[in-house]
């Protein structure tokens, strides 16, 4: 906000959830309301570099040495086979739980339908999952109807310019059309005429007209490279993978649940999902589902959890120990970070005798 203005000059005050009886007043609005009024900075936090750090620490490897062309890694985006488990054991047809950008139910459904087989296909998936009106009612229908496959739908904004140039349109016009489509402004009648004159398929033109926002390919590439690296560890050094995931993003990891075995974890997931359908589950419980799915996957892969040990457990790190995962003090429900750190400090001063 410029120094000479107040935020209230741009955001009329409102009550949360438009409740006039609330005593709280906020200036929080959807960013689209202010999109053309003030500059918005997207300062996003990323935990991937932190996960890299722990992967290297727990495995004594370098994440940058992971190859981008391992066929087994790509198989993970199509089935559970690389994990050595059946779909029934983890309640999922593919093995991407815990893989950033590819581990949500939405993106997993896309993977199942699109069946990506290469890095380029995964770029398409990443672009489709981050765009607006690009997948649902658009690329998804084209794939379902057999009109084209994942390799040929419009996945990232760069595709439009490159495709149009390949069809023979002038570079400058191809760029202009890409910019208009990616911003949701569609096509002019003149552009449509030019595209048809160069034999651009009708389905492609129709797809362009539906798009509201498109993801850039370079951004998608960064996400896919991270996903490939993490998928490699998940397959080949699973203990390091799970320890890193739980350490960096525990998402309510509860030792009292994890230590009760696979069936109890499965029952807990089903209970939360059932209550969430009835709008009875808390946001904290819902956010813990992704962690519970990984815990269940550990059990399916015969990876054990070791109980909290006063001498061996870390305050917050999940540690590899003889092919198993040693739980930290922070995984105890109700034990805060400071209390966990204090236990470690006391242990370092002198051993516990009782």
Language-model segments: residues:
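Noncatalytic, beta-rich nucleic-acid-contacting surfaces in large DNA/RNA-processing enzymes
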Residues: 1-354
